[in-house]
C-alpha cells in the first residue's frame, strides 16, 4: 500500500518538501474533511500555519465551530512536522491529546506550529541519552491577530532513538512468542 509519506518522498524529488506537504495536506481527504487549510510552511519546515474557516461545514448545533473540527485541524502537525525535522533515525508517535475550549468561535481560526533549532538539538540529544521520552506540544487556535484564544490543544508526543525502538519491539515480540 502506498502511504502519504512515500508519496511525499517521491514528490520531494521534484518540488521542495514544504510545498509538497502543503499541497498534500490541502488535497488529502483526511485533512480536507476538517475544512482547515495549510496556508504556510517555511522552507526550513520550522514553522507551519493553518486556517480553519468558520463555515456551514464545521458549524455545530449552536452555530459555532465544532470542537472536533478544531481538534482535527491541528491534530497531525506536531508529530508530522517533528518527524520531518529530526529525520529517519528517530521514531515519533502521537501518544495522547487534551483539548481545552476557551470560548465559542464564530470566526476563522488560525494556528501556528513552531519548533526552534535549539529544541530540535535538545530532542536529538535527549533521544541519544535516554533512548525514549515524551514531550508536550501546545497549540493555540486564535483569531487572525492572535488577540483571542478560542481553543488550546496539548499533544503528548513520543520520541525514540530508532535503533532502540526496533530492539524494544523485537524484545516484545520474543516475549510474546515464549
For the regions a language model picked out, list residue spans one by one.
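Short structured motifs
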Residues: 33-38, 95-101, 122-124
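Catalytic strand-loop segment that frames the active site of acyl-thioester-processing enzymes
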Residues: 33-64
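Alpha-helical membrane-targeting segments
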Residues: 1-33, 57
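Residues located in well-ordered beta-strands
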Residues: 37, 98-100, 112-114, 140, ...
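A generic structural signal for short beta-strands and their flanking turns/coil linkers
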Residues: 34, 46-48, 93-97, 107-111, ...
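Hydrophobic beta-strand-centered segment that forms part of the acyl-chain substrate-binding groove
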Residues: 81-119
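HotDog/MaoC-like acyl-thioester-processing domains
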Residues: 2-15, 105, 116-178
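Hot-dog-fold acyl-thioester-processing enzymes
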Residues: 56-77, 91
